[in-house]
Amino acid sequence: MEYIALTGIADSLIEVLKKHNLRTLEIRSPQNFVGVLGLNAGDSVLLTSTSLQDLTDGTQGLIAKVVQKQVSVHSVVSSNELYIEEREAMSARIQLECRCMARVRSVISNELGKPVKVDAREISCYEAR
């Protein structure tokens, strides 16, 4: 099945999601942010600790269902007598519900500025490799 993949997610966070079933993540990395923009409540997403550059066939991850999504903009203004500087940063918060473990069959799309898409299949906890 085809999924949007969020890469470089901390192993500890994936373990917490497995144990507690429902967690909210704040996504700030540009590539994962683009992926989250392509998700809606009810969609499934693949989370993996593997970096974007190392994502290949056989990579393992966790499939989770998106319960909620929220995109926000944070503005920071700093100034002195000479200038005023305003910076904005966008982030997304997604609430995820753990579904199952999965293994990537193939990477469909891995282009900069576009959601990372993979074809993955669910795996049981007894499947060895």
Spans of model-derived segments:
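Compositionally biased, charged N-terminal/linker segments
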Residues: 1-41
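A generic structural signal for short beta-strands and their flanking turns/coil linkers
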Residues: 23, 41-43, 60-62, 92
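Contiguous surface segments at macromolecular interaction interfaces
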Residues: 61, 75-129
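Hydrophobic beta-strand residues in large extracellular and virion-surface proteins
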Residues: 4-6, 42-47, 66, 94-98
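Short histidine-centered beta-strand/loop micro-motifs
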Residues: 17, 36-38, 55-58, 77
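Short beta-strand-centered aromatic/proline hotspots
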Residues: 55-74
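Short coil-to-beta transition motif at edge beta-strands of beta-rich domains
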Residues: 36-53
